Amino acid sequence: MQKIGIYPGTFDPVTNGHIDIIHRSSELFEKLIVAVAHSSAKNPMFSLDERLKMIQLATKSFKNVECVAFEGLLANLAKEYHCKVLVRGLRVVSDFEYELQMGYANKSLNHELETLYFMPTLQNAFISSSIVRSIIAHKGDASHLVPKEIYPLISKA
């Protein structure tokens, strides 16, 4: 059976920090599913289709990465793909508190599921999608924070 990991997120928009985690985690799995969440509760700036297109463009050079959109429980998506490992990023202490709760919740729904946490590299530690959204909303230049393939798409927002 293939070793499969799932890296879920809203990716609104995808950042260099996300790509760094995709790069590092894709080396640990035969297949990495990047799962773009519907996340209507977060009121995303970009539509699900736009976010999926952006992540596909940004990951096209990764041979073992597949990008999918999903709605519903992540634990169910993991079962669908026969995945036993979730990949998550931790930038700050508050991320850990949230991710720990989510990890326990996912484990309670799917007992085979483990969560693997990645700390960002130093140059990406401060980057978040919300910072990028704020910069582009104020007509600033966020090109150094996102993959070059997607900057033309987000700079029009």
UniProtKB/Swiss-Prot annotation:
Checking Pfam families in the record gives: CTP_transf_like
Major subcellular location class: cytoplasm
Question: Which pathway does the protein contribute to?
Answer: Cofactor biosynthesis; coenzyme A biosynthesis; CoA from (R)-pantothenate: step 4/5
Name what cofactor the protein needs: Mg(2+)
| A GO term from the CC aspect | cytoplasm
- What does the function comment of this entry state? Reversibly transfers an adenylyl group from ATP to 4'-phosphopantetheine, yielding dephospho-CoA (dPCoA) and pyrophosphate.
What this protein is called in its record is: Phosphopantetheine adenylyltransferase
**Species whose genome carries this gene:** Helicobacter pylori (strain ATCC 700392 / 26695) (Campylobacter pylori)
The gene name reads coaD
